[in-house]
């Protein structure tokens, strides 16, 4: 493989879960891209999600954010169907177009409010338009991770597809 490797780190502490277990076909079917999900630790009430890569915050919603790093865009979704909460239980600490480093705080969210609203607290972390074959060094399901721990790597293959 040629190209540079981008490390995608965990935005929250928790347990790694396969995307196939996310109760939303957009993620479980890898329609938006490949990656993993992180299940918040039992008993967690509020968590501050951090940037999984260094880059530019290109989209920020209370329940989700996207960070662009090189040719890749990483989507972090805080819970499933949490768009229906209309921002309740979420506090944003960053602004769109802000330059972020790995570990910079982006959004604090209430796991308690997500679960009270009967939504899944699983947090998918995906690289948009990627496939499982694009990912390397994938952290195994069931592994406990802290914020900033490696989830997986993806290689920038843009130089391989330069003919247009």
Functional labels for PLM-detected ranges:
Residues 1-164:
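Contiguous, well-folded functional domains in the mature portion of proteins
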